[in-house]
């Protein structure tokens, strides 16, 4: 196993660890919510408020861990592509060397700064890999197509028997279906234009 592969393993491990921390925070949030109910039942509003603050703090922490886990995971996928293509630059290798201790610390600020460095390295790599990504499915990009996210959210809401529009901020209701429809319309228009060009 090369050094770069070891670092790649560490990145993937860190993403899982961050994910585990998010789940731990979720569990803590649920425990705090149970304590809120008990305190309210006893008529102790002040204690309930403290547990509510704790629950919100745990929820926010879980979101932060999840967000960072996804970011580290995306960078790991980009490193994997770079390793596969043999496009690991010296500056990228330098950033990778400094990461092991940072990832072990589970300090979100330090990890975020490290991910910033990585993403900067990948901006230059992106230009080189664009042709390859055009021929492959772009599963390694850092961003996810919004319409796919919206469709999955709608699908999950339907499965759970929930109305997704209730969760959307005002003014955005119905945007899920509309964005999917407009994307499909764009794709159809492009296909039609290509067919006309061929004739």
Swiss-Prot record:
<comment type="function">
    <text>Probable peripherally associated component of the endosomal sorting required for transport complex III (ESCRT-III) which is involved in multivesicular bodies (MVBs) formation and sorting of endosomal cargo proteins into MVBs. MVBs contain intraluminal vesicles (ILVs) that are generated by invagination and scission from the limiting membrane of the endosome and mostly are delivered to lysosomes enabling degradation of membrane proteins, such as stimulated growth factor receptors, lysosomal enzymes and lipids.</text>
</comment>
<dbReference type="GO" id="GO:0005765">
    <property type="term" value="C:lysosomal membrane"/>
</dbReference>
<feature type="region of interest" description="Interaction with IST1">
    <location>
        <begin position="132"/>
        <end position="156"/>
    </location>
</feature>
<dbReference type="GO" id="GO:0036258">
    <property type="term" value="P:multivesicular body assembly"/>
</dbReference>
<dbReference type="GO" id="GO:0061763">
    <property type="term" value="P:multivesicular body-lysosome fusion"/>
</dbReference>
<dbReference type="GO" id="GO:0051469">
    <property type="term" value="P:vesicle fusion with vacuole"/>
</dbReference>
<dbReference type="Pfam" id="PF03357">
    <property type="entry name" value="Snf7"/>
</dbReference>
<dbReference type="GO" id="GO:1904930">
    <property type="term" value="C:amphisome membrane"/>
</dbReference>
<dbReference type="GO" id="GO:0006914">
    <property type="term" value="P:autophagy"/>
</dbReference>
<dbReference type="GO" id="GO:0001778">
    <property type="term" value="P:plasma membrane repair"/>
</dbReference>
<keyword id="KW-0175">Coiled coil</keyword>
<feature type="short sequence motif" description="MIT-interacting motif">
    <location>
        <begin position="186"/>
        <end position="196"/>
    </location>
</feature>
<dbReference type="GO" id="GO:1901673">
    <property type="term" value="P:regulation of mitotic spindle assembly"/>
</dbReference>
<feature type="coiled-coil region">
    <location>
        <begin position="15"/>
        <end position="47"/>
    </location>
</feature>
<comment type="subunit">
    <text>Probable peripherally associated component of the endosomal sorting required for transport complex III (ESCRT-III). ESCRT-III components are thought to multimerize to form a flat lattice on the perimeter membrane of the endosome. Several assembly forms of ESCRT-III may exist that interact and act sequentially. Interacts with CHMP1A. Interacts with VTA1; the interaction probably involves the open conformation of CHMP1B. Interacts with CHMP2A. Interacts with VPS4A; the interaction is direct. Interacts with VPS4B; the interaction is direct.</text>
</comment>
<feature type="region of interest" description="Interaction with VPS4A, MITD1 and STAMBP">
    <location>
        <begin position="180"/>
        <end position="196"/>
    </location>
</feature>
<dbReference type="GO" id="GO:0015031">
    <property type="term" value="P:protein transport"/>
</dbReference>
<dbReference type="GO" id="GO:0006997">
    <property type="term" value="P:nucleus organization"/>
</dbReference>
<keyword id="KW-0813">Transport</keyword>
<dbReference type="GO" id="GO:0032585">
    <property type="term" value="C:multivesicular body membrane"/>
</dbReference>
<dbReference type="GO" id="GO:0005886">
    <property type="term" value="C:plasma membrane"/>
</dbReference>
<protein>
    <recommendedName>
        <fullName>Charged multivesicular body protein 1B2</fullName>
    </recommendedName>
</protein>
<dbReference type="GO" id="GO:0039702">
    <property type="term" value="P:viral budding via host ESCRT complex"/>
</dbReference>
<dbReference type="GO" id="GO:0097352">
    <property type="term" value="P:autophagosome maturation"/>
</dbReference>
<keyword id="KW-0472">Membrane</keyword>
<dbReference type="GO" id="GO:0061952">
    <property type="term" value="P:midbody abscission"/>
</dbReference>
<keyword id="KW-0653">Protein transport</keyword>
<dbReference type="GO" id="GO:0043162">
    <property type="term" value="P:ubiquitin-dependent protein catabolic process via the multivesicular body sorting pathway"/>
</dbReference>
<dbReference type="GO" id="GO:0030496">
    <property type="term" value="C:midbody"/>
</dbReference>
<dbReference type="GO" id="GO:0090148">
    <property type="term" value="P:membrane fission"/>
</dbReference>
<feature type="region of interest" description="Disordered">
    <location>
        <begin position="167"/>
        <end position="199"/>
    </location>
</feature>
<feature type="compositionally biased region" description="Polar residues">
    <location>
        <begin position="170"/>
        <end position="183"/>
    </location>
</feature>
<feature type="region of interest" description="Interaction with VTA1">
    <location>
        <begin position="180"/>
        <end position="199"/>
    </location>
</feature>
<dbReference type="GO" id="GO:0000421">
    <property type="term" value="C:autophagosome membrane"/>
</dbReference>
<dbReference type="GO" id="GO:0007080">
    <property type="term" value="P:mitotic metaphase chromosome alignment"/>
</dbReference>
<dbReference type="GO" id="GO:0000776">
    <property type="term" value="C:kinetochore"/>
</dbReference>
<dbReference type="GO" id="GO:0046761">
    <property type="term" value="P:viral budding from plasma membrane"/>
</dbReference>
<keyword id="KW-0967">Endosome</keyword>
<dbReference type="GO" id="GO:0005829">
    <property type="term" value="C:cytosol"/>
</dbReference>
<keyword id="KW-0963">Cytoplasm</keyword>
<dbReference type="GO" id="GO:1902774">
    <property type="term" value="P:late endosome to lysosome transport"/>
</dbReference>
<feature type="region of interest" description="Interaction with VPS4B">
    <location>
        <begin position="183"/>
        <end position="199"/>
    </location>
</feature>
